[in-house]
Amino acid sequence: MGSILEKIEQALKDMLIGWIESNLTNMFTDVNEKVGTIAAEVGQTPSGWNGGVYQMIRGLSENVIVPIAGIIITFVLCYELISMITEKNNLHDMDTWMFFKWFFKAAVAIYLVTHTFDIVMAVFDIGQNVVSGAAGVIHGNTSIDIDATIAQMRTGMENMGVGELLGLSIETLLISLCLKIMAILITVILYGRMIEIYCTVSIAPIPIATMSNREWGSIGTNYLKGLFALAFQGFLIMVCVGIYAVLINGMIIADSIHSALFSVAAYTVILCFSLFKTGSLAKSIFHAH
């Protein structure tokens, strides 16, 4: 009778250990894949992320916003010309060189507006290059050895009773669910960032049109700061994910499986909070309003 109960207990333990290992395998696989997935997403330029949306935004910008930018350029250049003439002792001290200066400013302003998308794409190409370089370093140093980790944990699980294994299986299920929710939140953050990029790019000709004027130029300058902040937000996202992966990799080899799992849950919450803060951090770094 005792041997039968022992066999039943061992069968239950084997079943629970198998379930726990399955949950852990899925969990660690998600962690490894998430680093690569986020790198692929945040490294996309507006033209590469979704070609259809990009063409729509570019069409709206060129057909709707550029004419408005042309009106703004006209106003800015007229204001600039009047200021240049009147500031020289009320027309009594005029220099023909100022007109060459004005024509140069006009040419620069028109060139910037007509090449707005080239300028904007250059900013995001820089951001993509930085993110791609970071992805290679981060993913190469933080990939979790799933087989070795599971084997190490199995040694500890074999010494547990049925009740403790049942509790551990529930813990792994909850942590795995937490990671799934985190994946959804990360998707929301990444898609929200791209939508913000498209909205910012769509109106680019208007702030760019003001850059040739001293008084209005701060509008265009601040706009470019915001563009660089959006481009380098991807790098900050990669840094957050890299820190997350390193911390999880360190907790996996902890002596207490329960402690390691709850640490994973805590780091997951911290990661989500950090990702939400990357946008404001990037803007503060580039001093963009």
Regions found by a protein language model. Give the residues of each.
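Gly/Ser-rich, low-complexity
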Residues: 1-72, 88-97, 107-178, 217-222, ...
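Hydrophobic alpha-helical transmembrane segments
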Residues: 67-79, 197
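Membrane-embedded alpha-helices of multi-pass transport/permease systems
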Residues: 75, 120-123, 127, 185-188, ...
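Membrane-water interface regions at transmembrane-helix termini and the short interhelical loops
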Residues: 81-94, 183-187, 215-216
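Alpha-helical transmembrane segments of helical membrane proteins, especially in multi-pass transport
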Residues: 175, 179-211, 225-247
